[in-house]
């Protein structure tokens, strides 16, 4: 820490009282009272030197001025006093021990004796004082800069505190201006969000319109396909019905043909026995051959047997006698034949009309067809074929009536 002692010349106040001899044991003993001397760091002593006691206050009319005994008017220099404020953090305390105090005191005494012999130069002292003043001015300048920096920091901190106060007041809700600004910001944000939602809604409406158009297109396609499917279903139902009718007619024809074959077989046996019995005792002109393999062979065999019996019994009769026999015989179709003709007429009515214009017969009722055969394997004609039903079963007889 740098200290400065202000020297002030005064004609009336220039005498310092003599310093008493200190007692032994305090480390600052003096043999005789020396002359008053000012000791400063970096400044040469002026005039005679005196070591004052640190425990005794010096009486002075002006505080802050150290009286240094008798000072000559010729050698006095007036120095302006400048007060320096030093921060507490820059002060360091150095407490010397007892031995160091004694050594420094002895060394200081030798310096005082040597300096007393040297004659000081006023110009040199003036230059040194100027240097000290320059240093003090520099330190003052630095302190002013520090003060300015601290002032700026204080101003910034004050502004921050003001803003914090505003925020605190706004958070409490007592500031209507902040509330109005917040409402304005929220309104602007809501306007932007509303515009974005409006654009999204427009895009969604366009997509919805396109989707509705596509839905209409696919609905029309579906309806058209449904109509086509219904037509195909009806056509399939008709074809299935015709197929079942044709199958039933074929089965009926085959069953009738089987019955005719059995009857013709029995007729063949009867005719052969009759022909053999007629040739009894005579030369046999007929001998039984192998059994026929088809209905046509069976019919041909029966026809030959009938001719042989006819020739044996009646002989050779001329054509004139055959013409006398009435030939106006009207044949009727069997139920199976009628069913077959009906199926053919349904499948191709034009061809049936052209091929058999003279074959006109009354169609038999369904009751007649059902009574002639117990189960002809057909479906009921009035069903819709969702659930396939038969018009006959193994335990029932008669016609099924669709309600």
Curated annotation (Swiss-Prot):
Coiled-coil blocks: 123-216
Post-translational modification: ADP-ribosylated by tankyrase TNKS and TNKS2. Poly-ADP-ribosylated protein is recognized by RNF146, followed by ubiquitination. Ubiquitinated by RNF146 when poly-ADP-ribosylated, leading to its degradation.
Signal peptide: none
Keyword Coiled coil: yes
GO MF term list: ubiquitin protein ligase binding
Disordered, as annotated region: 1-63
Main location per the UniProt record: Golgi
Record flagged with keyword Ribonucleoprotein: no
Superkingdom of source: Eukaryota
GO BP term, example: Golgi to plasma membrane protein transport
Motif (Tankyrase-binding motif): 22-26
One Pfam short name: DASH_Hsk3
Subcellular location: Golgi apparatus membrane
GO cellular component: Golgi apparatus; Golgi membrane; nucleus
UniProt-annotated stretches for the region Essential for interaction with GORASP2: 397-403
Keywords: ADP-ribosylation, Coiled coil, ER-Golgi transport, Golgi apparatus, Membrane, Phosphoprotein, Protein transport, Transport, Ubl conjugation
Sequence positions bearing Phosphoserine: 53, 356
InterPro entries: Golgin-45, Hsk3-like
Subunit structure: Interacts with GORASP2. Interacts with the GTP-bound form of RAB2, but not with other Golgi Rab proteins. Identified in a complex with RAB2 and GORASP2.
PANTHER family: BASIC LEUCINE ZIPPER NUCLEAR FACTOR 1 BLZF1 PROTEIN, GOLGIN-45
Domain description: The tankyrase-binding motif (also named TBD) is required for interaction with tankyrase TNKS and TNKS2.
Record's function text: Required for normal Golgi structure and for protein transport from the endoplasmic reticulum (ER) through the Golgi apparatus to the cell surface.
Name of the featured protein: Golgin-45
Gene source species: Mus musculus (Mouse)
